[in-house]
Amino acid sequence: MLTDPGLRDELDRVAAAVGVRVVHLGGRHPVSRKTWSAAAAVVLDHAAADRCGRLALPRRTHVSVLTGTEAATATWAAAITVGAQHVLRMPEQEGELVRELAEAAESARDDGICGAVVAVIGGRGGAGASLFAVALAQAAADALLVDLDPWAGGIDLLVGGETAPGLRWPDLALQGGRLNWSAVRAALPRPRGISVLSGTRRGYELDAGPVDAVIDAGRRGGVTVVCDLPRRLTDATQAALDAADLVVLVSPCDVRACAAAATMAPVLTAINPNLGLVVRGPSPGGLRAAEVADVAGVPLLASMRAQPRLAEQLEHGGLRLRRRSVLASAARRVLGVLPRAGSGRHGRAA
């Protein structure tokens, strides 16, 4: 709701750059509560803010007041009354308006686009959980692979991305909050088309806030988020388990691994009951995958025999899965259990 032609032109130009549609409402068409609440963002001038403030409209997010000059005291008062989060002088603060409309458009898409989150953890050390997490990420149409084991040397080594430019966990100065997925994606390395947030070759610790923020950004971006978890139940690990649509417990097919899976399963289900088992061969004593699942008390999602020459491949450029490989087939079966991402809609500014 802008009466100044110059401010209207500024808004139209910024909105076109962001990719949102603007609906202009003038003084002859007072805003209704429905229109006020339905728009992805509301942009007002001083007069419109004063008018909407007198209507006692409900408080909402993404309300901005634009001015062409230094904001007067009366403008700030009108902005506070209407519940605006920003008072922006144009064109000097155009960048802030761009960010505000982009965030509003992304928020409007949240209900339509929602990626799935899968957390992968080993029943015991050396179970192959990290490898299976990489296989899931490679088998997904678009994935974010999140390394949550700060003492494992970096999952980027498993995808051949150790020299790829981009941020790793220690590079992120992040406490939590809401992140823009496009910005996250642009900052991360993408070896073989997978966005990877990896650890490094030096130790560090992870807090729950940044982990939750990164997972949430990927989910809102509509990608499949694959979290590789350590067997230590830290706050960061529990944040990923809480956020997961599916927790995958990976176990070798031997007696000791079977016992370890049975020990780990109730701990995991107490945090997230959506737990399934993947059993990896070989089976030196003839134990069957279904028997491991019965002992662990966990539904069997997939089983697979040992993949030949896997260790050699990992030493020379990381995991590269052929579509018909046993790892890829098992990964597709697990991905088939996840909820499908919806389709989004474009945001609208009023």
UniProtKB/Swiss-Prot annotation:
Gene knockout outcome: Essential for growth.
InterPro entries, A to Z: P-loop_NTPase, ParA/MinD_ATPase, Ssd-like
Organism (species): Mycobacterium tuberculosis (strain ATCC 25618 / H37Rv)
Function: May play a role in septum formation.
Miscellaneous remark of the record: Was identified as a high-confidence drug target.
Annotated GO MF terms: ATP binding; ATP hydrolysis activity
GO CC, alphabetical: cytoplasmic side of plasma membrane; cytosol
Domain of life: Bacteria
Protein name: Uncharacterized protein Rv3660c
Induction of the gene: Induced by albendazole and thiabendazole, which inhibit the GTPase activity of FtsZ and probably septum formation.
